[in-house]
Amino acid sequence: RLTSVTGVQTCALPIWIADRYKNEPVILGYELFNEPIAPYFENMEELNGKLEDVYKKGVAAIREVDSNHIILLGGAQWNGNFKPFKDSKFDDKIMYTCHRYGGEPTQAAIQTIINFRDSVNLPMYMGEIGHNTDEWQAAFCQTMRENNIGYTFWPYKKMDGSSFVGITPPENWANIVYFSEAPRATYKEIREARPAQAMSRKAMMDFIEACKLKNCVVQEGYIRSLGMK
């Protein structure tokens, strides 16, 4: 819980990254935290109240070495809640970033995000979309274009159709998945669920081979759904 311990806050500040890339024009900017403060945290509201202050500390630390780049601030609860933010003027090169994977692909579904964007008069960037049907994604991309919200997809590569390229599961991969999801409250349960070591090693090596681009399947429908060719 990065916003609850001062020492962790200090360690988390990405000063070394900013120092390394401060003169690199290909870098859009730095996102301080990815999806901070999960909705299942027992002290969620308390942490929400501290988030903006932690962001201010992070921005100030970066500005010690880099005054060039934009800094992206993600909302609380999967980058979706922007109510904790009260001060959008503490730096002149910040923008906000949101994520969305489900719900209706309509403007009404993201109206609160649009309203926040308009109220602070700063850009809103949809940093992650994906994990849905091609039809949903095409409709949602259209909604974002109509509302002047830039977006990127996630991920580029995975084991189903909701990505640019798909990985074909290797032989015995189902056994690896079963082991990862099996009960493991005791060592007995772990031993009983564990697949043979030789088979597991071969499945993992085959997975690495399957991940190579030359062995992946290009998902044409997914690419079209993003408005790309």
Where are these regions (language model features)?
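Single conserved hydrophobic/aromatic residue that forms the stacking wall/gate
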Residues: 1-7, 11
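Extended, alpha-helix-rich binding/interface surfaces that flank or overlap catalytic cores
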Residues: 143, 147-229
